[in-house]
């Protein structure tokens, strides 16, 4: 299964250039960026032109958000955490990884920075917004514990139907996963994965289908997901347990839901920017963070 891209803040090198050029102007004579027959482009020329780009304010906002988050919570996100997430994507996409980066407008370094921004945002959310007992009880009503399944992802429905027929004929699920699954991250281990109800990388249709299965059962019809069709077999579906013993998992589930809520995350980022005293000095770019100053819709 391909992970859903949920990169909240995209960082662009143009924003870096914008601030660097701004600093150069205040510290030294106007330098040449380029020359041509009959003229030249100076740093001030380029800076002025750059500010007219429709995306410049967005890129500046993203850069400031990242720096504010990193200053406030950088010690809470290790390089290993970012590298592990990066390697997970790299393994998942295999030889298509560079194409994945290109399609989403990333270099390898900017993708790592975006992953770090995601982790920093999650830390900020947990620091600035707490989960109440009533919210935990609401989640408990539909909570599911960590389950382990095997799955086979196919690109078309007919292949998934054939897999189900092969299983009915007595063929081994793990063997079929190795030959028929297109999920390079799990096919070699028989398609085995474990997940909790707060998992953000799996389609809801996948999780819903899995939760309906008893140990040893598999889906009798293909399950449609974002990037194909799934056949799922339940390996371990434990009992729900008690509310008290599940509080940690319930809290994680609430935070996972909040992290996907743009209005909640807007308020969190707004508070981070306020706490870090972020101010834009250039009057032409002064409104770059205005969307974080407006009240977000309450959920």
Swiss-Prot record:
Record GO cellular component, one term: plasma membrane
Membrane topology recorded in Swiss-Prot or TrEMBL: Lipid-anchor
Physiological role: This protein is essential for production of active forms of the serine proteinase located in or secreted from the cell envelope.
Signal among keywords: yes
Family: Belongs to the PrsA family.
A GO term, aspect molecular function: peptidyl-prolyl cis-trans isomerase activity
Signal sequence, renumbered to the chain: 1-23
Key word Membrane present: yes
Domain PpiC: 144-236
Protein name (database record): Foldase protein PrsA
Species annotation: Lacticaseibacillus paracasei (Lactobacillus paracasei)
Location(s), subcellular: Cell membrane
EC number: 5.2.1.8
């Amino acid at each position: 299964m391909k992970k859903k891209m949920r990169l909240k803040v995209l960082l662009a090198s143009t924003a870096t250039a914008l601030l660097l050029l701004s600093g150069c102007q205040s510290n030294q004579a106007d330098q040449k960026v380029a020359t041509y027959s009959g003229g030249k482009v100076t740093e001030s020329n380029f800076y002025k032109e750059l500010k007219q780009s429709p995306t410049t304010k967005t890129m500046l906002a993203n850069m400031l958000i990242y720096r504010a988050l990193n200053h406030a919570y950088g010690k809470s996100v290790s390089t290993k955490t970012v590298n592990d997430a990066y390697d997970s994507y790299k393994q998942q996409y295999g030889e298509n990884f560079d194409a994945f980066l290109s399609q989403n407008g990333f270099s390898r370094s900017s993708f790592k920075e975006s992953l770090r921004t995601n982790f920093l945002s999650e830390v900020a959310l947990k620091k600035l917004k707490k989960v109440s007992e009533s919210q935990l009880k609401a989640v408990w009503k539909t909570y599911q514990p960590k389950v382990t399944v095997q799955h086979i992802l196919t690109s078309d429905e007919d292949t998934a139907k054939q897999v189900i027929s092969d299983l009915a004929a007595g063929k081994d699920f793990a063997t079929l996963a190795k030959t028929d699954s297109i999920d390079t991250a799990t096919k070699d281990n028989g398609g085995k994965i474990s997940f909790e109800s707060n998992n953000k990388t799996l389609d809801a249709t996948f999780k819903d289908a899995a939760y309906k299965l008893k140990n040893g059962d598999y889906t009798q019809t293909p399950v449609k997901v974002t990037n194909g069709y799934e056949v799922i077999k339940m390996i371990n579906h434990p009992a729900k347990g008690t509310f008290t013993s599940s509080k940690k998992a319930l809290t994680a589930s609430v935070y996972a839901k909040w992290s996907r809520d743009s209005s909640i995350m807007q308020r969190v980022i707004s508070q981070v920017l306020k706490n870090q005293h972020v101010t834009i000095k250039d009057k032409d770019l002064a409104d770059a963070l205005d969307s974080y100053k407006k009240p977000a819709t309450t959920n």
